[in-house]
Amino acid sequence: MKSLILAEKPSVARDIADALQINQKRNGYFENNQYIVTWALGHLVTNATPEQYDKNLKEWRLEDLPIIPKYMKTVVIGKTSKQFKTVKALILDNKVKDIIIATDAGREGELVARLILDKVGNKKPLRRLWISSVTKKAIQQGFKNLKDGRQYNDLYYAALARSEADWIVGINATRALTTKYDAQLSLGRVQTPTIQLVNTRQQEINQFKPQQYYTLSLTVKGFDFQLESNQRYTNKETLEQIVNNLKNVDGKIKSVATKHKKSYPQSLYNLTDLQQDMYRRYKIGPKETLNTLQSLYERHKVVTYPRTDSNYLTTDMVDTMKERIQATMATTYKDQARPLMSKTFSSKMSIFNNQKVSDHHAIIPTEVRPVMSDLSNRELKLYDMIVERFLEALMSPHEYDAITVTLEVAGHTFVLKENVTTVLGFKSIRQGESITEMQQPFSEGDEVKISKTNIREHETTPPEYFNEGSLLKAMENPQNFIQLKDKKYAQTLKQTGGIGTVATRADIIDKLFNMNAIESRDGKIKVTSKGKQILELAPEELTSPLLTAQWEEKLLLIERGKYQAKTFINEMKDFTKDVVNGIKNSDRKYKHDNLTTTECPTCGKFMIKVKTKNGQMLVCQDPSCKTKKNVQRKTNARCPNCKKKLTLFGKGKEAVYRCVCGHSETQAHMDQRMKSKSSGKVSRKEMKKYMNKNEGLDNNPFKDALKNLNL
């Protein structure tokens, strides 16, 4: 009898097979005399569509809503049905005694496996592999500590409840809004509050009125002292009067105080923090960061599990620090890492906290030493950031003297503040940081002359527009960005982790871009006209971050066995009925403000011009038509003159590439450029390798250009 191991992806199945020496390769699985390891391809089973309940529901009609099945059905996904049949046969095989679930250790990973097992009708015992990295050592250790699968039943119930609730709310709200207003409109329990978050920030900026204020400083022996005051001066004349009082008056040093202080490194990375920093440093979006991180985790095995919301490690990891540090010696941080090899680490360090780790600990390097030449440019940047943060967390604090010099002149107090570094500590890892010395020439009681006075004019600034990084953080902590009637609501939002989860937020932002509810202009995210109208037409409850946080709180309670999934689903059904009735009875109107005179080639109706993340697109106004045409999109092809990215207009042989500098070239010229760059003929293998580069080439212009080449 054998144990069947079910992994989430083929790559993880191969890693498990390698770690456990399961060497016999079969069609869709690996096998030895103890184990069989097979895989899903992400989800193999999903929720049925409305028309799979009733073929009459294929056509969207307002009168058919709400669609609330008595029992939710699941179906096998067509394009991966072959692998499902393989997995099913193995589950039902008489030589298989039990199932080891080895999908991702989290809510969604549990759902992937359980939907398959339920669809097959499995009755065999379950065990669970729960690991945070897929290195050989981690897998082998995990198999020595397999858990009883029943321990994760509540996790599955929470995952299933989330999936079914999203289906019930999303299908009905989207169909109701679309059929009511004859427009492609979409609602969801996470996406709609996110639009509201962006809209609230946009309104704050639009309503902001700048105010002028003034500050006064004195220069003494080359050092600038600032006027100490509890108020902001909006009247320049007040400061000018103070300056007049200071003329021909000497000052006196009232005190020179030195206080020794320490600063500590930032927390280890969770996914949201890492995505935010990648955008801040390199303008790499959250989705691209997650994909790159997944590659570092699965393919290279040099970092731990990506989809974590924790900034801490568990105390049982203390003894693994040295081997992880050893792995980082392959990086440019080897000189900073080397002294840490002789340091003793304790579970009392602030980075170790069992109470602040739920499913997975913070993202840190594994014990696998990377082959740096194997990493892409983006993978290298991301890995370096993780290593930098990890090493900083293990280093000593940064120490400095905070010096405050207080000056009195004509009854007014001025202050000079300087920080003098005494111990670099963790800041030694960053270039440009060094020990500083301040030869401040002041002593208490000194009489000093004022060499210059300076009144500076300032202006208050509005809050910044969200970018892809800061929007993620706002989704995690929406209570910091919206006004709430009751403080307990802020606590609810904080406890539940805000809108969405670390695993879903990047996808939500991406979806909002694709549905033209939000747009990015020069890195500033704004709500489109369509997004604003969605907020106006949607039921108010569905636009509130608080509501989705309360739902998430209940899902967490289900996960902990403290709330019934059935109760939650019934609440979602009642909520959906109210939403649909509200939309049906609404007398509001939807207006296309981007309607063009271009006729749809499929149905003849006028098309709508929409902005996408990378350009513009024409979309048929009829939701049932679904015809789309690219108008323009930014590509990764570079201008031969100024090296900026070219924008593609049109498609096929008629396509034209244009640059902001004025350069323009036809598709034929681009083809020729590609040929000469590749020394003539381009092989299929070379082209496939080029197109698969993990460097954000999702909208690669050469997909169109190269298909016309005679390869």
Curated annotation (Swiss-Prot):
Binding-site residues for Mg(2+), renumbered to this chain: 8, 104
InterPro entries xref list: Topo_IA, Topo_IA_2, Topo_IA_AS, Topo_IA_cen, Topo_IA_cen_sub1, Topo_IA_cen_sub2, Topo_IA_cen_sub3, Topo_IA_core_domain
Region annotated Disordered, chain positions: 691-711
Domain named Toprim: residues: 2-135
Superkingdom of origin: Bacteria
Catalytic center residues: 305 (o-(5'-phospho-dna)-tyrosine intermediate)
GO MF terms, alphabetically ordered: DNA binding; DNA topoisomerase type I (single strand cut, ATP-independent) activity; magnesium ion binding
Entry EC no(s): 5.6.2.1
Alphabetically ordered keywords of this record: DNA-binding, Isomerase, Magnesium, Metal-binding, Topoisomerase
BP-aspect Gene Ontology terms: DNA recombination; DNA repair; DNA topological change
Family matches, as PROSITE patterns: TOPO_IA_1 (PS00396), TOPO_IA_2 (PS52039), TOPRIM (PS50880)
GO-annotated cellular components: cytoplasmic replication fork
Cofactor: Mg(2+)
Reactions catalysed according to its record: ATP-independent breakage of single-stranded DNA, followed by passage and rejoining
Site positions per UniProt: Interaction with DNA: 60, 167, 175, 307
Domain Topo IA-type catalytic: 152-580
Region Interaction with DNA, annotated ranges: 186-191
Family, per entry: Belongs to the type IA topoisomerase family.
NCBIfam families associated with the record: PRK07726.1, topB
Chain's role: Releases the supercoiling and torsional tension of DNA, which is introduced during the DNA replication and transcription, by transiently cleaving and rejoining one strand of the DNA duplex. Introduces a single-strand break via transesterification at a target site in duplex DNA. The scissile phosphodiester is attacked by the catalytic tyrosine of the enzyme, resulting in the formation of a DNA-(5'-phosphotyrosyl)-enzyme intermediate and the expulsion of a 3'-OH DNA strand. The free DNA strand then undergoes passage around the unbroken strand, thus removing DNA supercoils.
Protein name: DNA topoisomerase 3
Species per Swiss-Prot/TrEMBL record: Staphylococcus aureus (strain MRSA252)
Upper taxonomic lineage: Bacteria, Bacillati, Bacillota, Bacilli, Bacillales
